[in-house]
């Protein structure tokens, strides 16, 4: 059975990105994205907002931290991932997030932060 996991989102950061490093030294950057959806219902304009957490690794993470700020408009190309963990009390938790392969800066930036496997100039 063929499988396909691709997500493309455009939205605005709701806060500045957080950058941290794993014990192995891998950069990890997380930022929440507000994605708006506009539609009409019964001749009335409506809007929904979806808040999605995005996580980037390596070079994409470091460049995202350097260039992004709250309010930045970005286009994210990535995949949907489910993170699972257990609390100290033994409760199982999970959350969905988008793992970014690349982040395109729409306003105030130039270029793309490519995925780790790519070697494109910025």
Model-assigned labels for residue ranges:
Residues 1-4, 18-24, 40-47, 62, ...:
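Acidic, gly/ser/pro-rich intrinsically disordered tails
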Residues 3-6, 30-32, 51-53, 77, ...:
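Residue-level recognition of specific faces of alpha-helices
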Residues 8-16:
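Structural detector for short beta-strands of small beta-barrel domains
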Residues 14, 20, 57, 81, ...:
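Conserved positions in beta-strands of structured domains
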Residues 21-34, 94:
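Short aromatic-glycine-enriched beta-strand elements
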Residues 45-59:
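Disulfide-stabilized netrin-like
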Residues 57-93, 106-107:
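Beta-rich strand-turn-strand
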């Amino acid at each position: 059975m063929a499988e396909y996991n691709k997500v493309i989102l455009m939205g605005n950061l709701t806060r500045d990105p957080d950058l941290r490093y794993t014990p192995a030294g891998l950069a990890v950057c997380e930022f929440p994205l507000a994605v708006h959806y506009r539609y009409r219902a019964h001749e009335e304009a409506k809007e929904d907002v979806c808040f999605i957490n995005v996580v980037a690794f390596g070079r994409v993470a470091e460049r995202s931290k350097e260039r992004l700020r709250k309010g930045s408009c970005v286009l994210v190309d990535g995949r949907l991932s489910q993170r699972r963990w257990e609390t100290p009390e033994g409760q199982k938790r999970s959350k969905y997030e988008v793992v970014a392969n690349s982040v395109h800066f729409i306003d105030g930036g130039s270029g793309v932060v490519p995925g780790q496997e790519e070697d494109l100039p910025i």
